[in-house]
């Protein structure tokens, strides 16, 4: 029998992000403090979201509304990288990108943390934009999952294919 293993990934459920975007757009259209400010939120390509408003403050408030909806939908804010409002004519625009996948340098940090602080006999292999963690006992893998959940990395981590 093969050793137990699991994958550490950073993925976003695009449908949940779309639901959060639609909820935020509905709230921006109905809220009293956003009336008449021309505040809009929409997709900008596959992995980016654009917010527009007449004032910088309304733009930042719209970002907060969208972040609140992301949290309610169970999406980590580490997966949403938002820039600063930039003026273009009479409108302020902000573009936020959805971050998926674990970068090589972050994967190395995670692997090093597992080697240094994790149980003995647990290995982590970097496989593209994810990590495969394997060990002799399932209890050791549970310990590694708890270790990674308690650590603060710059990406939202999920654990899948636990077998």
Swiss-Prot record:
Keyword Nucleotide-binding assigned: yes
GO MF annotation terms: nucleotide binding
Coiled-coil portions: none
Recorded GO CC terms: cytosol
Name of the protein this chain belongs to: Nucleotide-binding protein SACE_6882
Source organism of this protein record: Saccharopolyspora erythraea (strain ATCC 11635 / DSM 40517 / JCM 4748 / NBRC 13426 / NCIMB 8594 / NRRL 2338)
Function recorded in the entry: Nucleotide-binding protein.
PANTHER family cross-referenced by the UniProt entry: UPF0234 PROTEIN YAJQ
Pfam families in the cross-refs: DUF520 (PF04461)
Cross-referenced InterPro entries: DUF520, UPF0234-like_C, UPF0234_N, YajQ-like_sf
Keywords: Nucleotide-binding
The UniProt record lists the keyword Lyase: no
Entry-linked CDD domains: YajQ_like
Membership in a protein family: Belongs to the YajQ family.
SUPFAM superfamilies: YajQ-like
